[in-house]
Curated annotation (Swiss-Prot):
It holds the Pfam family RrnaAD. One of its GO terms (molecular function) is 16S rRNA (adenine(1518)-N(6)/adenine(1519)-N(6))-dimethyltransferase activity. One of its GO terms (biological process) is rRNA methylation. S-adenosyl-L-methionine binds at N31, L33, G58, E79, D104, N129. The gene is rsmA. This is Ribosomal RNA small subunit methyltransferase A. It comes from Staphylococcus aureus (strain NCTC 8325 / PS 47). It catalyses: adenosine(1518)/adenosine(1519) in 16S rRNA + 4 S-adenosyl-L-methionine = N(6)-dimethyladenosine(1518)/N(6)-dimethyladenosine(1519) in 16S rRNA + 4 S-adenosyl-L-homocysteine + 4 H(+).
Length: 297
């Protein structure tokens, strides 16, 4: 039987909406979870214990936050919508281990906030129902900063989650797969139906688990340049890497032979498409490119 105090039920969420006269903002991608079973699955996948610090993005009315607070040492939640701050102050009042920061996660000084609020935690996890319209920027922003995050269990649009977790050669595999898998080991936790949200989103959802690698999957001396090179191979998915790189490099059309030579030395067939290349293949291309100063972009 569900605790009738749980926020993640249709009746309690509706009561809070009425109490605070809250209207959803489509521009902020607000879809509140109203199913405790889904939340419990997220908590279980997160392996949270009494020594874990949690970063949550977009707590909404606190349906996931309250469950995190019951399991974790501390919860640091970022909420962009000022209208939700009094609601969260109300719903989370029983918990003294939760800090809510009213800021845009993409503009916040996350490193400083972690140092101030989660410094005594042995492990840090990001656990969140992410705003779907900025899922990718949020994840890349967190992964590419010097923040001691051990892993992520996050809900997102199903299509985006499948891209993060995609295998080489699959339709969903692309530059986003490469960046995320460079930093983390990815796995699917569960698919989530539209019916467990208020209001229901227009798309299906998925929960994915991303655990930080102790070392990146490949070693490169400039991650930004490496990711740009990989992304260029997917510029036009139906074209070969040879064609895509001719369009990518400055004066690429004049350096057709150089591009072919570069691909050959890296052991990559120029007729292949970007989605057939592994992260290791792109690392070979990146290293070999250093021998060809003509290839600028």
């Amino acid at each position: 039987m569900l605790d009738n105090k749980d926020i993640a039920t249709p009746s309690r969420t509706r009561a809070l909406l009425d109490k605070y006269g809250f209207n959803f903002k489509k521009s902020l991608g607000q879809n509140f979870l109203i199913d405790v079973n889904i939340i419990n699955n997220i908590i279980d996948a997160s392996d949270i214990d009494a020594q874990t610090g949690v970063i949550e993005i977009g707590p909404g009315m606190g349906s996931l936050t309250e469950q995190l607070a019951r399991h974790a040492k501390r919860v640091l939640a970022f909420e962009i919508d000022q209208r939700l701050i009094p609601v969260l102050n109300d719903t989370l009042s029983p918990y003294d281990n939760v800090t809510v920061i009213n800021e845009d996660i993409l503009k916040a000084n996350i490193k400083e906030a972690v140092e101030n609020h989660l410094q005594d935690c042995e492990k840090i996890m990001v656990v969140a129902n992410l705003p779907y319209y900025i899922t990718t920027p949020i994840l890349l922003n967190l992964m590419q900063q010097d923040i001691p995050i051990d892993g992520y269990v996050v809900m997102m649009q199903k299509e985006v989650g499948e891209r993060l977790n995609a295998e080489v050669g699959s339709k969903a595999y692309g530059s986003l797969s490469i960046v995320v898998q460079y930093y983390t080991e990815t796995s699917k936790v569960l698919t989530v139906p539209k019916s467990v949200f208020m209001p229901p989103p227009n798309v299906d959802s998925i929960v994915v688990k991303l655990m930080q690698r102790t070392e990146p999957l490949v070693t490169v001396d400039n991650e930004e340049a490496f990711f740009k090179l990989a992304k260029a191979a997917f510029a036009q998915r139906r074209k070969t890497i040879n064609n895509n790189y001719q369009n990518y490099f400055k004066d690429g059309k004049q350096h057709k032979e150089v591009i072919l030579q570069w691909l050959e030395q890296a052991g990559i067939d120029p007729r292949r498409r970007g989605e057939t290349l592994s992260i290791q293949d792109f690392a070979k291309l990146y290293e070999e490119k250093k021998k060809f100063p003509q290839l600028e972009n």
